[in-house]
A protein has these predicted regions:
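Active-site beta->alpha loop and helix N-cap motifs at the rims of alpha/beta catalytic domains
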Residues: 1-58
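Catalytic alpha/beta core domains of metabolic enzymes, predominantly
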Residues: 39-40, 44, 52-138
Length: 138
C-alpha cells in the first residue's frame, strides 16, 4: 500500500501487481489484495499482472469478472503461455467496460499476441531491441 501511495504521489500512469505469492490464496483474497492496492492510490489506474508460471496463481475468468467491478482496473498484462487468454481477457474487458487494454507479456509470443488482439506488449527484450519489435508490430 505504501508503494502504491508513493507511486501516485510521483505521478505514475498506472500501478501493476501480481497476486500475493508463496501461499495459494482463494480468489476473494486475491481480489481484496488487488482492490486494497488500488484503493491506496485512488487516482491512479490499475493493471492486473497475470503471470501464473511465476506467481503460482492464474487469473481465472471469475476473478477477472470480480476485478472488472473496480473502475480503476484498465488493463491486464498477460504473461500466461496460452495466447487464447489474451482473447478471453480482451473480450470480457470490452464487454464489462467498453474500453480495455490487454498487453502481451512473453517476448516470444509478441506477434501471436498482437495478431489475436493484444493492444501492445510489455516484455523483457522490447527495450533492448526496440527496432525489432516496432518492425514486428507493423
Amino acid at each position: 500500500m505504501e508503494l502504491a501511495r508513493h507511486s501516485e504521489e510521483v505521478g505514475v500512469d498506472a500501478i501493476a501487481s501480481i497476486p500475493p505469492i508463496y501461499f495459494r490464496l482463494p480468489e476473494y483474497s486475491i481480489a481484496a489484495y488487488w482492490n486494497a492496492i488500488s484503493a491506496a492510490a485512488p487516482n491512479t489506474d490499475f493493471v492486473i499482472y497475470n503471470i501464473p508460471q511465476l506467481a503460482g496463481t492464474a487469473l481465472t475468468m471469475s476473478l477477472f469478472a470480480e476485478m472488472m467491478k473496480n473502475p480503476k482496473v484498465v488493463a491486464v498484462k498477460n504473461s500466461s503461455m496460452p495466447t487464447q487468454d489474451i482473447q478471453m481477457f480482451k473480450a470480457a474487458g470490452m464487454a464489462a467496460k467498453g474500453e480495455f487494454i490487454v498487453f502481451n507479456g512473453p517476448d516470444e509470443q509478441f506477434v501471436a499476441g498482437r495478431a489475436i488482439g493484444a493492444d501492445g506488449g510489455i516484455g523483457g527484450t522490447y527495450g533492448v531491441m526496440p527496432e525489432l519489435f516496432l518492425k514486428l508490430n507493423e
